[in-house]
Amino acid sequence: VPVPLNYRLADQEWAYIINDSEAKLIIVKGNEYSDRINQISSELKNIKKYISISLDNSIEKFHDFYDWLSDSSNEKPALKIDENYDVYQMYTSGTTGHPKGAVLLQRNVAANIRQYLNSLTLPRPSRTLLVAPMYHAAAMINMCGCIAIGGTIVIQEDFIPQDVVDCLANEKITHTVLVPAMIQACLVSVPNVASNEYNDLDQIHYGASPIAPETLKKAMDVFKCKFGQGFGMTETVAVICLMTPEEHIRAIEEKPDLLKSCGRPAIDTQVEIRDENENPLPVGEIGQICAKGPQIMK
């Protein structure tokens, strides 16, 4: 079961997550991360093997990724996967205490892919730009949704506005997932953003915060594509609510307040706003968001 690590966390936070998840194997890229792991290796209780990609073979404890692969069996594992098997464990920071590990099952991920694709229909063939960090729920739904329809994933390690714009224009990208701040950065900091042609770009999806009407309108004018929004959290794979491209057009043309909404509940999902005693609240009241659906973690 993979456990993606946020590379921005402190070493001791890494140690906590690695131990709490009972991980047996660590795979890192490059010497920077292998050096950091070596500094905490004495604290790691369950790790049996350390693997590094692009290693210069001089780091203690670490084995080369490709050597490790070549030594592995070509036989299909004698394992029958069912809907209740774990797919991954992703850590999310709570309001207090240590990060919490959300365990997502095969049925959770499959359900959320179906919900995502039902509201935000992807073009076929599909080719997505994955620039959201891969320890984040947004990256998971972007990646899994594309894989589910046999699409291609183009990965960029870091968010660099010029690189993102160039990729959207030149790599036949059909869709991507960004946050509004990333969209805004592409619009204001890339000199050629408006002069490029984005002939294959069909959709940009966003989340994490509302998008300003002026940002959305400018993005629609520049990229000439549809926009969709997802709202959710790590514990729900990715989304519990979605706002369709049609609703974004309506927001721009007649009702900008729609952009303050997190969208409508995904199919097979119940969403309520409740008070501290779990009582449902009327429209317009502030409370806690409660959700029930097949995408919720076990």
Name the predicted role of every residue range.
Residues 148, 173-178, 187-257, 270, ...:
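Gly/Ser/Thr-rich phosphate-binding loop
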Residues 87-111:
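Conserved AMP-binding A3 loop
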Residues 52, 57, 72-91, 98, ...:
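Conserved pre-ATP/AMP-binding loop-to-beta segment of ANL
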Residues 25, 32-84, 190:
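ANL superfamily adenylate-forming
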Residues 110-127, 135-175, 189-190:
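Conserved AMP-binding/adenylation subdomain of ANL enzymes
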Residues 1-5, 14-15, 116-118, 137-149, ...:
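Hydrophobic alpha-helical segments in the ANL/AMP-binding
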Residues 1-27, 101-103, 152-158, 228:
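Short beta-strand->loop structural element characteristic of the AMP-binding/adenylate-forming
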